[in-house]
């Protein structure tokens, strides 16, 4: 079946079925390492010298070459705060002006806190608008982790997680780990936000509602405020811990030990290389 026919079938099916039941538990497959030269292209913003308030010394003092190279893709409704999340983390400031994203990549580095090793992150921003539905899957190949985002001040964006975003990423990246991220947490208790939603018979999304949806996705759940820089570092530290742990598990389970049986450490530093996201 050709790629175009396959995609047509998916989009036709996604309109009929708004909810997809998670598949049986499958250990996420580890992606292959990618060099920065492969990652960097036109439109990529390199942020190795990030001035993030929480990461200044870490980002500027990293001198060792990356031990890991990971790709994170961010999806969610347009205007829910995806770009602000990536810019706040990688560049250390909150963009006040909203400019819709088509595709944008950010390259930055951080430390895996347990091991102290350097991790290079390629952060892929995507467009949430419907007119880009057929272009967005181009971002998915070789993804190590997915951030599925919604805005806490917009209950409809959480509904769309199960109606649109989870089915889409499950289709294209069935074994890639997911973190559900509640954005704009600073608006939950803001009076103007509460009053505006009240006129529509709505309330801001509660932590319990976010946790419930994450449970249906078999995903981790975190919240943050990019504007206040609250919880942003925790979002990415959880992501880094997740993908590094998966790679270490792959070393233990997929490579032979000195006795020739599975379960050994990497031999000569070599790792099994696999892709977990692809366009069929």
From Swiss-Prot:
Matching InterPro entries: P-loop_NTPase, Small_GTP-bd, Small_GTPase, Small_GTPase_Rho
Modified residues (Cysteine methyl ester): 277
Gene Ontology CC: one annotated term: plasma membrane
Biased composition (Polar residues): 33-59
Subcellular location per the Swiss-Prot or TrEMBL entry: Cell membrane
Lipid-substituted positions (S-geranylgeranyl cysteine): 277
Record's bilayer topology term: Lipid-anchor
Propeptide segments, given as residue ranges: 278-280
Gene Ontology molecular function: any one: GTPase activity
UniProt-listed CDD domains: Rho4_like (cd04132)
Location of region: Disordered: 13-59, 251-275
Family: Belongs to the small GTPase superfamily. Rho family.
Protein name, as recorded: GTP-binding protein rhoC
Annotated organism of origin: Emericella nidulans (strain FGSC A4 / ATCC 38163 / CBS 112.46 / NRRL 194 / M139)
């Amino acid at each position: 079946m050709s790629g175009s026919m396959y995609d047509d079938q998916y989009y036709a099916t996604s309109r009929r079925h708004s909810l997809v039941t998670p598949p049986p538990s499958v250990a996420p497959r580890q992606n292959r390492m990618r060099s920065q030269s492969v990652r960097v292209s036109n439109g990529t913003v390199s942020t190795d010298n990030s001035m993030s308030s929480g990461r200044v010394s870490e980002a500027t003092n990293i001198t060792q070459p990356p031990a890991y190279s990971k790709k994170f893709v961010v999806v969610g409704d347009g205007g829910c705060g995806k770009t602000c999340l990536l810019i706040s983390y990688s560049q250390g400031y909150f963009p006040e002006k909203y400019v819709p994203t088509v595709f944008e990549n950010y390259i930055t580095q951080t430390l895996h806190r347990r091991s102290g090793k350097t991790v290079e992150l390629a952060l892929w921003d995507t467009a949430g608008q419907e007119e880009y539905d057929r272009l967005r899957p181009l971002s998915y190949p070789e993804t190590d982790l997915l951030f599925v985002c919604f805005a806490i001040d917009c209950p409809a964006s959480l509904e769309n997680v199960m109606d649109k975003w989870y089915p889409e990423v499950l289709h294209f990246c069935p074994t890639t780990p997911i973190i559900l991220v509640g954005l704009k947490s600073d608006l939950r208790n803001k009076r103007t936000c509460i009053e505006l939603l009240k006129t529509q018979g709505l309330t801001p999304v509660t932590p319990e509602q976010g946790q419930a949806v994450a449970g249906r996705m078999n995903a981790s759940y975190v919240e943050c405020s990019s504007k206040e820089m609250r919880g942003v570092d925790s979002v990415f530290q959880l992501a880094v811990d997740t993908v590094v742990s998966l790679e270490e598990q792959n070393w233990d389970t997929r490579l032979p030990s000195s006795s020739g049986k599975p379960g050994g450490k990497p031999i000569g530093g070599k790792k099994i290389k696999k892709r977990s996201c692809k366009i069929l």
